Amino acid sequence: MQVSTAALAVLLCTVALCNRISATFAADTPTSCCFSYISRQIPQNFIADYFETNSQCSKPGVIFLTKRGRQVCADPSKEWVQKYVSDLELSA
């Protein structure tokens, strides 16, 4: 009986530790990544907000949120993207 109680205790501790570790990794996983960029400039008045992709993504990107709720990936090295980001930061 003591062996099964000890085994159960070890099993419960292992499960608790695994759940804690997986929760930590889940918090760091990127939610959105860009795999391609929009090919042309979109009108600035369509943009409501933006966020940058996580560093774990394969490509860097800026994701613009449009006023209609769409997400659009843009190349952060493009001049117009940098201007939109700067303007959004100033208006925040």
UniProtKB/Swiss-Prot annotation:
Coiled-coil regions listed in the entry: none
GO terms for biological process, alphabetical: antimicrobial humoral immune response mediated by antimicrobial peptide; astrocyte cell migration; calcium ion transport; calcium-mediated signaling; cell activation; cell chemotaxis; cell-cell signaling; chemokine-mediated signaling pathway
Domain of life: Eukaryota
CDD domains: Chemokine_CC
Residues at the site labelled Involved in GAG binding: 40, 68, 70
Gene Ontology molecular function: CCR chemokine receptor binding; chemoattractant activity; chemokine activity; kinase activity; phospholipase activator activity; protein kinase activity
Subcellular localization(s) per the UniProt record: Secreted
InterPro entries xref list: Chemokine_b/g/d (IPR039809), Chemokine_CC_CS (IPR000827), Chemokine_IL8-like_dom (IPR001811), Interleukin_8-like_sf (IPR036048)
GO CC annotation: cytoplasm; cytosol; extracellular space
Pfam families on file: IL8
Range of residues in the leader sequence: 1-26
Main location: secreted
Keywords of the record: Chemotaxis, Cytokine, Disulfide bond, Inflammatory response, Secreted, Signal
Disulfide-linked positions: 33-57, 34-73
Cited PANTHER family: C-C MOTIF CHEMOKINE 3 (PTHR12015:SF183), SMALL INDUCIBLE CYTOKINE A (PTHR12015)
Known partners and oligomeric status: Self-associates. Also heterodimer of MIP-1-alpha(4-69) and MIP-1-beta(3-69). Interacts with CCR1.
Function summary: Monokine with inflammatory and chemokinetic properties. Binds to CCR1, CCR4 and CCR5. One of the major HIV-suppressive factors produced by CD8+ T-cells. Recombinant MIP-1-alpha induces a dose-dependent inhibition of different strains of HIV-1, HIV-2, and simian immunodeficiency virus (SIV).
Family label: Belongs to the intercrine beta (chemokine CC) family.
Protein name in the entry: C-C motif chemokine 3
Lineage summary: Eukaryota, Metazoa, Chordata, Craniata, Vertebrata
